[in-house]
Amino acid sequence: MNRDVLTGAAIFRASSYLDFAVLVVAGEIDISNAEAFRDHLQALVAGPNPAVIVDLSLVTFMDSAGLGVLIGALRGIHRAGGTLRLVGTGAHLVDLFAVTGVHKLLPLHPTVAAAATT
């Protein structure tokens, strides 16, 4: 399942890796497209025991709206008994996650393969 969807300044691509649904996000995530980001994530977590990896490696900017979507997704996935893992090594993401403390809830992995085997 590969499909690209362009929304605002972001592109979303859904695929799979091992037993995980993968959402690759490219571009900027902010208030203008946070709802689309949320919709893409919700589509991947609809089933029982969802296992989702969000690959943020190609994200060039994220604000608090994007963080809110990720935290909301984490809560929903945990309620469903599932797993949410993130990929991203960009300095802007690492800094954003560290400053806000989100890295304690959602650590960033260097690759999809690393996230899947953690």
Regions found by a protein language model. Name each.
Residues 28-106:
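Amphipathic alpha-helical interaction surfaces in cytosolic regulatory modules
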Residues 114-115:
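Short alpha-helical segment
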Residues 107-111:
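Short acidic-hydrophobic, aromatic-tinged amphipathic segments that line or gate anion-handling sites
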Residues 3-4, 46:
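Short, charged helix-to-loop "capping" segments that act as catalytic/coupling loops
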Residues 1-3, 118:
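Positively charged, low-complexity terminal tracts
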Residues 4-39, 58:
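STAS-typified acidic loop motif
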